[in-house]
């Protein structure tokens, strides 16, 4: 059996640009893509923490060190400059692979600079956020 599993995420990034008049996608700082093991053109889910919107799109590599998280095209109707977002990628793997796989978690600050890398999807670094109740990963 092949399962679709959580592969990586850029956690609580700040949207720096929103361009409605673009063909689509999300532009992401190359350093963040590399740290999260996300390739240009890869499918990502974007969860807007600010307003609850969820969408799927593909990534475009942005300038390294720029901190860019740019929402392009129709998604700019759902996600605004200044919103806090989580970019999530998934991968298909066998059950055996899934049981052994460790995801790449990239925690960023308000300027989208990396503050910590990890593998625990339930880890909460932001003040006021807690681990989900009864989560067993540590």
Swiss-Prot record:
GO biological process, any: alanine biosynthetic process
UniProt keyword annotations, A-Z: Autocatalytic cleavage, Cytoplasm, Decarboxylase, Lyase, Pantothenate biosynthesis, Pyruvate, Schiff base, Zymogen
Residues annotated to bind substrate: 57, 73-75
PTM annotation (Pyruvic acid (Ser)): residues: 25
Example of a GO cellular component annotation carried by this entry: cytosol
InterPro entries recorded: Asp_de-COase-like_dom_sf (IPR009010), Asp_decarbox (IPR003190)
Claim: Cytoplasm is one of the keywords in the record: yes
Active site, renumbered: 25, 58
Pathway: Cofactor biosynthesis; (R)-pantothenate biosynthesis; beta-alanine from L-aspartate: step 1/1
Reactions catalysed: L-aspartate + H(+) = beta-alanine + CO2
PTMs per UniProt: Is synthesized initially as an inactive proenzyme, which is activated by self-cleavage at a specific serine bond to produce a beta-subunit with a hydroxyl group at its C-terminus and an alpha-subunit with a pyruvoyl group at its N-terminus.
Localization (cell): Cytoplasm
Highest taxon of the lineage: Bacteria
Entry keyword annotation includes Repressor: no
E.C. designation(s): 4.1.1.11
Cofactor notes: Binds 1 pyruvoyl group covalently per subunit.
Principal location listed in the UniProt entry: cytoplasm
An annotated Gene Ontology molecular function: aspartate 1-decarboxylase activity
Cofactors demanded by this protein: pyruvate
Entry similarity comment: Belongs to the PanD family.
Physiological role: Catalyzes the pyruvoyl-dependent decarboxylation of aspartate to produce beta-alanine.
HAMAP family: PanD
UniProt xrefs under PANTHER family: ASPARTATE 1-DECARBOXYLASE
Subunit structure: Heterooctamer of four alpha and four beta subunits.
Protein name as annotated: Aspartate 1-decarboxylase
The species this protein was found in: Renibacterium salmoninarum (strain ATCC 33209 / DSM 20767 / JCM 11484 / NBRC 15589 / NCIMB 2235)
